[in-house]
Amino acid sequence: MESSRRPLGLTKPSVDQIIKIEAEGISQSRLQLLNPIPGVWFPITLGFRALPNFRREKSFSLHKDRECLLPTESQLQSKRDIGIDTTDGLLKHLMASRSSYCPDGIFTILEQGPMLAQSMATISTELSGSQANRPTLRPLPILLKGTQVAMRLFLLGLRPVRYCLKVFMLKAQEGLHLLVDLVRGHNPVGQIIALEAAPTSASLPLL
């Protein structure tokens, strides 16, 4: 009687018990007899160790790919929620610290032509016959998180992400090149004068 009983508790199952269970088919009730931890189920296969339980193993030593490491959180991240635009400093910090992870990539953000730099420095607009110089263009604060996500994806070295960023930057440069001509061609004063000169229903004589 004693020899026919199955061992319970923390006793490891023998090879004969495992082979017998494999032959009869795995069931939850039989696995419960072999599992030292109640309430946790995992199959037992010959020649392999049992997988670690996710409830008790919170950290695993996985092989990390150096090419896919994300940048660490810097001190500039702490200023996101207090209204300070840290986009320029964050981009410089990421490019200086993680530029070696993209040996085959193209940093279109660093490629600024003389025409782009000149258009971003000062943009002259013609309003009422006078020129007003606007300060340097900066990304909107609402785009700060989007810029950070784009930089993190770019540092991963993914070819489609690099291609999308390259196309986006080229389109942005093209828009900045044409911005000055578009602003100069827009004359709001002439449109206002034309609207005031048009006859209205109040000025028409009554019949």
Curated annotation (Swiss-Prot):
It is found in: Virion. Keywords: Virion. Belongs to the coronavirus I protein family. The keyword Isomerase does not apply. This is Protein I. It holds the Pfam family Corona_I. The gene encoding this protein is included within the N gene (alternative ORF). GO terms for cellular component: virion component. Disulfide bonds: none annotated. It comes from the Viruses. Structural protein that is not essential for the viral replication either in tissue culture or in its natural host. The keyword NAD does not apply.
